C-alpha cells in the first residue's frame, strides 16, 4: 500500500501564466511525472492546475536557490521567464532581495520588487526584473538537427514565414507576421514544436509589430500548449526584432503584449486572480545586442496544501 503525504505550495501567476511553487529547501521534495501532471491538471480542486510547477531546492553553486521547472505534461525544462519573476517575488516576500536563481538553462540575476506588498503597482520599478542569459543563436546551441549558418531565417512550415531561432535559456522559434497573431499558435503550435529540425522541441512564438516599440505576441509553449503569456518568449521575440530590424528602437526597449494585454485593452475593469489590478499587462524587455533583461508583473493567488 503506497503512502500519501501532503506538500505545501504557493499558487502564483505572471500575466495569467500560472505556477504551483513548492519550497523544498528545508524538506526535500522529489516528484515524478505522474505527480507533476496531477498537480498541474486543471481539474485539480486544490491547485486549480497550472502551466508550470516550480520546485525550489538549495543552490547547487553560488546562487540563492535552484529552481527546478516542470511543464504541465510532466517534462522537465531549462527555463521559465515568468516563473523566474514569480520566484524572485516569492523569495523577496521571505526577505531575500534580488535573489540569484539557478536553473538548468543558466544562472539568473534578479532585481526583486521594491514593494512586495504591491507587486502589481503601476510603477514598473516595483515589478520583478530578471537579467537573462546571453542569447545563443548558433545551430548547435539552439539546438537544430542540421547545421545551418543562418538561424535567423529557418523554414519550419511551407505556409508560414521563416522563423528566427534562438536559445534564451530554452529554445524558441519566432515567426513575424504582418497582421494579427490570433489563432496562429493554436493552429500551428503543436506541429511546429515537434518539427524534425528541433530535436529537443521548441517554444513557438507568433509576433506582429503594432507600434513604435510594441509587439503583439502569441506563444505555444513546449510541453504546456497555449499560454496567456511567456517570459522567455517575450525575450526571444525582442531578440528577433532587434536582429531583424523589425522596430526602429533607439532605446533598445520593447513592450511585449501577450493575449491578456489585448484582453485588458478591451476590458479595463477585468481583474482575474490579481493578474491586472490596474497595471499594464505587458512584459518589458531591454536588449542591446548582448545584454537581455525582462520585467513584468506577477501575483500571489493563494497558499495551499496538496496530498500526493
Identify the residue ranges that each predicted region occupies:
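A glycine-rich beta-to-alpha transition motif near the start of alpha/beta enzyme domains, typified by
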Residues: 1-125, 174-308
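N-terminal, positively charged, Ser/Thr/Ala/Gly-biased leader segments
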Residues: 1-28, 130, 142-166
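Membrane helix-loop-helix hairpins that form the core translocation module of multi-pass transporters
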Residues: 127-135
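A generic alpha-helix propensity feature with a strong bias for hydrophobic helices
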Residues: 136-138, 146, 152, 174, ...
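C-terminal domain-closing interface element
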Residues: 138, 145-151, 156-158, 166, ...
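Selected transmembrane alpha-helices and immediately adjacent juxtamembrane segments
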Residues: 163, 171-174
Amino acid at each position: 500500500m503506497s503512502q500519501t503525504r501532503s506538500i505545501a505550495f504557493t499558487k502564483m501567476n505572471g500575466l495569467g501564466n500560472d505556477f504551483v511553487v513548492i519550497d523544498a529547501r528545508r524538506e526535500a521534495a522529489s516528484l515524478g511525472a505522474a505527480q507533476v501532471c496531477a498537480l498541474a491538471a486543471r481539474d485539480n480542486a486544490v491547485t486549480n492546475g497550472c502551466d508550470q510547477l516550480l520546485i525550489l531546492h538549495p543552490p547547487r553553486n553560488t546562487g540563492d536557490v535552484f529552481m527546478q521547472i516542470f511543464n504541465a505534461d510532466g517534462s522537465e525544462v531549462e527555463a521559465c521567464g515568468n516563473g523566474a519573476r514569480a520566484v524572485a517575488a516569492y523569495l523577496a516576500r521571505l526577505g531575500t532581495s534580488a535573489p540569484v536563481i539557478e536553473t538548468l538553462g543558466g544562472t539568473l540575476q534578479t532585481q526583486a520588487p521594491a514593494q512586495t506588498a504591491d507587486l502589481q503597482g503601476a510603477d514598473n520599478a516595483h515589478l520583478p526584473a530578471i537579467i537573462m542569459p546571453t542569447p545563443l543563436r548558433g545551430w548547435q546551441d539552439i539546438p537544430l538537427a542540421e547545421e545551418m549558418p543562418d538561424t535567423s531565417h529557418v523554414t519550419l512550415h511551407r505556409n508560414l514565414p521563416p522563423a528566427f531561432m534562438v536559445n534564451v535559456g530554452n529554445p524558441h522559434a519566432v515567426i513575424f507576421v504582418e497582421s494579427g497573431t490570433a489563432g496562429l499558435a493554436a493552429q500551428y503550435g503543436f506541429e511546429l514544436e515537434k518539427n524534425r529540425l528541433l530535436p529537443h522541441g521548441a517554444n513557438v512564438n507568433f509576433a506582429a509589430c503594432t507600434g513604435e516599440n510594441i509587439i503583439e505576441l502569441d506563444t505555444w509553449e513546449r510541453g504546456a500548449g497555449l499560454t496567456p503569456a511567456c517570459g522567455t518568449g517575450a525575450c526571444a521575440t525582442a531578440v528577433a526584432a532587434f536582429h531583424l530590424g523589425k522596430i526602429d528602437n533607439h532605446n533598445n526597449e520593447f513592450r511585449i503584449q501577450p493575449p491578456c494585454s489585448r484582453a485588458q485593452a478591451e476590458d479595463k475593469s477585468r481583474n482575474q486572480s490579481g493578474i491586472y489590478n490596474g497595471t499594464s499587462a505587458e512584459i518589458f524587455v531591454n536588449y542591446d545586442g548582448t545584454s537581455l533583461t525582462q520585467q513584468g508583473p506577477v501575483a500571489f493567488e493563494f497558499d495551499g496544501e496538496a496530498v500526493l
